[in-house]
Amino acid sequence: MTAILERRESESLWGRFCNWITSTENRLYIGWFGVLMIPTLLTATSVFIIAFIAAPPVDIDGIREPVSGSLLYGNNIISGAIIPTSAAIGLHFYPIWEAASVDEWLYNGGPYELIVLHFLLGVACYMGREWELSFRLGMRPWIAVAYSAPVAAATAVFLIYPIGQGSFSDGMPLGISGTFNFMIVFQAEHNILMHPFHMLGVAGVFGGSLFSAMHGSLVTSSLIRETTENESANAGYRFGQEEETYNIVAAHGYFGRLIFQYASFNNSRSLHFFLAAWPVVGIWFTSLGISTMAFNLNGFNFNQSVVDSQGRVINTWADIINRANLGMEVMHERNAHNFPLDLAAIDAPSVNG
């Protein structure tokens, strides 16, 4: 038998680069999506840290009343934030070279746009990188599909909502108290708590937490012991072992008796699909809800819908929410508007019955 060995031609520099980028042997997989992900996320992270520490106040409402957001200008970790780009800029693309000076760029909140646009591109590439690595390893693509939920949520609050409202100044500030401010104002202007898609998102997040805790506790309680009583049950697991590590029949039997038989999964694949799909679909719906409310298709309004035979209003919780919404709307951007839009109309809605 004769073996013929051909000398392999030396690869070009580009070929070696391609092999390195797509190699699954690297400690951290890079991938073609990673080529774009790494610089965009590094840029977003670097600018966020610098701006959170040292950015000067930003004229968010476009009325020459700058709002401070950085640590060096009097904030702490809780109150600090990257202040959104000024309403004077609106939806215009506002890179550094579009401003007359760096001071003007900072005053108009340029860092917010820079961070948000790089961040969204980066997390989208991270999702693509998850798909790419799954493809290289011969896995199914559902990890990237699951990650699409937080990507959709971030895109909704940082991009779709500002587009719908006409200005990046309406985007979510990048900070703790700024996030809560965004939520309160969103409720005041769009009545999000009464939107069915937000309700589905709440069910998804809280339901997902419940199901995760239930699943983890059931599995941990039905481990197949491979150790003595003097050793931890966790020590009996070997990474990559072919045998089941817990008894799904025991877990199914326990839960079936605790609730009822058909409340428990007897198929591990169906169970784990359900655990993944429940929160993901819920967050998808909330993202869709934010994206529709961006264009002022708001939550249900049942204000003063209950009246007696004489036409007098019987106040319900919907009317209480209406009063709260008006109060929150009065308080926000108090120097930019004399009245909230609801109160500035010729015929103001009656809230006293």
Curated annotation (Swiss-Prot):
Site (Tyrosine radical intermediate): 161
Cofactor binding, per record: The D1/D2 heterodimer binds P680, chlorophylls that are the primary electron donor of PSII, and subsequent electron acceptors. It shares a non-heme iron and each subunit binds pheophytin, quinone, additional chlorophylls, carotenoids and lipids. D1 provides most of the ligands for the Mn4-Ca-O5 cluster of the oxygen-evolving complex (OEC). There is also a Cl(-1) ion associated with D1 and D2, which is required for oxygen evolution. The PSII complex binds additional chlorophylls, carotenoids and specific lipids.
List of residues binding a quinone: 215, 264-265
Residues bound to pheophytin a: 126
GO terms assigned for molecular function: chlorophyll binding; electron transporter, transferring electrons within the cyclic electron transport pathway of photosynthesis activity; iron ion binding; oxidoreductase activity, acting on diphenols and related substances as donors, oxygen as acceptor; oxygen evolving activity
CC per GO annotation: chloroplast thylakoid membrane; photosystem II
Topology relative to the membrane: Multi-pass membrane protein
Source species, domain of life: Eukaryota
Membrane-spanning intervals of the chain: 29-46, 118-133, 142-156, 197-218, 274-288
Residues annotated as site: Cleavage: 344-345
An individual GO BP term: photosynthetic electron transport in photosystem II
Residue list for modification N-acetylthreonine: 2
One Pfam family matching this protein: Photo_RC
Keyword NAD belongs to the record: no
Catalytic reaction list: 2 a plastoquinone + 4 hnu + 2 H2O = 2 a plastoquinol + O2
Intracellular or extracellular location(s): Plastid, Chloroplast thylakoid membrane
Residue numbers bearing the Phosphothreonine modification: 2
Residues at the site labelled Stabilizes free radical intermediate: 190
Residues noted as binding chlorophyll a ChlzD1 in the record, renumbered to the chain: 118
Subunit structure: PSII is composed of 1 copy each of membrane proteins PsbA, PsbB, PsbC, PsbD, PsbE, PsbF, PsbH, PsbI, PsbJ, PsbK, PsbL, PsbM, PsbT, PsbX, PsbY, PsbZ, Psb30/Ycf12, at least 3 peripheral proteins of the oxygen-evolving complex and a large number of cofactors. It forms dimeric complexes.
Extra remark: 2 of the reaction center chlorophylls (ChlD1 and ChlD2) are entirely coordinated by water. Herbicides such as atrazine, BNT, diuron or ioxynil bind in the Q(B) binding site and block subsequent electron transfer.
Protein's recorded name: Photosystem II protein D1
Organism of origin: Coffea arabica (Arabian coffee)
